UniProtKB/Swiss-Prot annotation:
It is an enzyme of class 5 (isomerase). This is Ribose-5-phosphate isomerase A. InterPro entries: NagB/RpiA_transferase-like (IPR037171), Ribose5P_isomerase_typA_subgr (IPR020672), Ribose5P_isomerase_type_A (IPR004788). Belongs to the ribose 5-phosphate isomerase family. It comes from Albidiferax ferrireducens (strain ATCC BAA-621 / DSM 15236 / T118). GO terms for molecular function: ribose-5-phosphate isomerase activity. The keyword Isomerase applies. It catalyses: aldehydo-D-ribose 5-phosphate = D-ribulose 5-phosphate. It comes from the Bacteria. Catalyzes the reversible conversion of ribose-5-phosphate to ribulose 5-phosphate.
Length: 234
C-alpha cells in the first residue's frame, strides 16, 4: 500500500530527492536506540540528518568503512555488529526495489556487510528515489561478492542463466571490497523470483554474497518522487 507524505517536492533534482528521503527516515529512529546504517549516496544524506539528533541515540552499526568514517566525523558513536544483539531499524538505499520490497544492492560494494547488519534489524527501511522502483529486478547490474579463485566458474554459471558477468574494476585493477574479496557485476538477468534466485546463487562455491535482498527485504520504502516522499509498505 502507499501513503504519500504531504511534502511537495516541486522540480527537485535527484540529489535533493535523496536529501528529502534521508530526512524523512529520521521518523523511524527511536530515542535511545542503536541504528543500523547502510552505505551509499542516499544513505550519506541520512547520516547527515542523523547528526541533528545524535544526542538522542546511542549510536550506529555501520555497513562499511566509508559510512563509519562519515558517522564518526559527525560525532555519532559506531558500534561493532558483534556488540549488538539486535537493532530496531536498518536504514539503507537500493539500486533497485520491486513492488514487494525485494532489492538489488551492492553498487557501493558493501553488500556483504549490508546483509549482516540488515539481518540484525527488526525493520528494514529503504530510502531511494523513484527511478529505483522497478517491476522486475535485473535492469541494474547485479553485484556479487566472490572469492577471486572462483571467478571463472561463477562467470560460467551466470552465463548458463543468460547473464554476463564482469569483474568490477577500480582503475585498471579489480576493486577489492572491505572484506578483501572482489565483485562481479552481472547484466542480462530478469529476476522474476528473487527469493529462489538468491537461494540458488548463494549456494555456489566461492560466492560470498549475492546482491539480491529477498531474505532481508525492505518492510518500508521511502520513495522520493516529483510529488514528494511516498511511503511504500510491504
Amino acid at each position: 500500500m502507499t501513503n504519500p507524505i504531504s511534502q511537495a517536492a516541486g522540480a527537485l533534482s535527484q540529489d535533493e530527492l535523496k536529501t528529502l528521503v534521508g530526512q524523512a527516515a529520521l521518523q523511524y529512529v527511536a530515542p535511545g536506540e542503536i541504528v543500523g546504517v547502510g552505505t551509499g549516496s542516499t544513505v550519506n544524506k541520512f547520516i547527515d540528518a542523523l547528526a541533528s539528533i545524535r544526542h538522542l541515540i546511542k549510536g550506529a552499526v555501520s555497513s562499511s568503512e566509508a559510512s563509519t568514517l562519515r558517522l564518526k566525523a559527525l560525532g555519532i558513536p559506531v558500534f561493532d555488529a558483534n556488540e549488538v544483539a539486535e537493532l530496531s531499524v536498518y536504514i539503507d538505499g537500493a539500486d533497485e526495489i520491486d513492488g514487494h520490497g525485494n532489492m538489488i544492492k551492492g553498487g557501493g560494494a558493501a553488500l556483504t556487510r549490508e546483509k549482516i547488519v540488515a539481518a540484525l534489524a527488526n525493520q528494514f527501511v529503504c530510502i531511494a528515489d523513484e527511478s529505483k522502483l522497478v517491476q522486475t529486478l535485473g535492469r541494474y547490474p547485479l553485484p556479487v561478492e566472490i572469492i577471486p579463485m572462483a571467478a571463472q566458474r561463477i562467470t560460467q554459471q551466470f552465463a548458463a542463466l543468460g547473464g554476463r558477468a564482469q569483474v568490477r574494476l577500480k582503475g585498471d585493477q579489480p576493486l577489492v571490497t572491505d572484506n578483501g574479496q572482489i565483485l562481479l557485476d552481472v547484466t542480462g538477468l530478469q529476476i522474476s523470483d528473487p527469493l529462489a534466485f538468491e537461494t540458488l546463487v548463494s549456494q555456489w562455491p566461492g560466492v560470498v554474497t549475492v546482491g539480491v535482498f529477498a531474505y532481508q527485504k525492505a518492510q518500508v520504502c521511502l520513495l522520493g518522487t516529483a510529488r514528494g516522499v511516498k511511503t511504500l509498505t510491504f
